[in-house]
From Swiss-Prot:
Recorded superkingdom: Bacteria
Protein role: Forms part of the ribosomal stalk which helps the ribosome interact with GTP-bound translation factors. Required to recruit RqcH, which is part of the ribosome quality control system (RQC), to stalled 50S ribosomal subunits.
Record keywords, A-Z: Antibiotic resistance, Methylation, Ribonucleoprotein, Ribosomal protein, RNA-binding, rRNA-binding
Name of the protein in its database record: Large ribosomal subunit protein uL11
Name of the gene this protein is made from: rplK
Entries under SUPFAM superfamilies matching the protein: Ribosomal L11/L12e N-terminal domain, Ribosomal protein L11, C-terminal domain
Keyword Calcium belongs to the record: no
GO cellular component terms attached to this protein's record: cytosolic large ribosomal subunit
Mutant lacking the gene: phenotype: Depletion gives a strong growth defect, a ssrA deletion and rplK depletion is synthetically lethal. RqcH is no longer recruited to 50S ribosomes, no change in RqcP recruitment.
Entry-linked Pfam families: Ribosomal_L11, Ribosomal_L11_N
């Protein structure tokens, strides 16, 4: 019989930088998970993606064991990296902070495809372009 899931914890942690300090420690401590075990495993799995924020979904079972799934980084994080900016615009409709080429948007959309609810790459690109627009980033051909 399959183990029963007691709790699902969703976090966004910088790749390779999980440690028992907040927010990781308290979230997993409440679920009774071995925090250091998770941190070591997460850091090993995400070591090659340094500098990105990785969403992770941790399933905690009755016997306090756990499994976790890492997702692709948020589109906003990938767009900021592509544009080379620290943060998006405070007033995206007035202040544009950067420009990104359409082929870079396609690259981000292809990276995000497994996690997006899109039928094809074009639909995924439109989602990423919408995120860019709301951050004050201009898309150019």
């Amino acid at each position: 019989m399959a183990k029963k899931v007691v709790k699902v914890v969703k976090l966004q942690i910088p790749a390779g930088k999980a440690n028992p300090a907040p927010p990781v420690g308290p979230a997993l401590g409440q679920a009774g998970v071995n925090i250091m075990g998770f941190c070591k495993e997460f850091n090993a799995r995400t070591a090659d993606q340094a500098g990105l924020i990785i969403p992770v979904e941790i399933s905690v079972y009755e016997d306090r064991s756990f499994t976790f799934i890492t997702k692709t980084p948020p589109a906003a994080v990938l767009l900021k990296k592509a544009a080379g900016i620290e943060s998006g615009s405070g007033e995206p409709n007035r202040n544009k902070v950067a420009t990104v080429k359409r082929d870079k948007v396609r690259e981000i959309a292809e990276t995000k495809m497994p996690d997006l609810n899109a039928a094809d790459v074009e639909a995924a690109m439109r989602m990423v372009e919408g995120t860019a627009r709301s951050m004050g980033i201009v898309i150019e051909d």
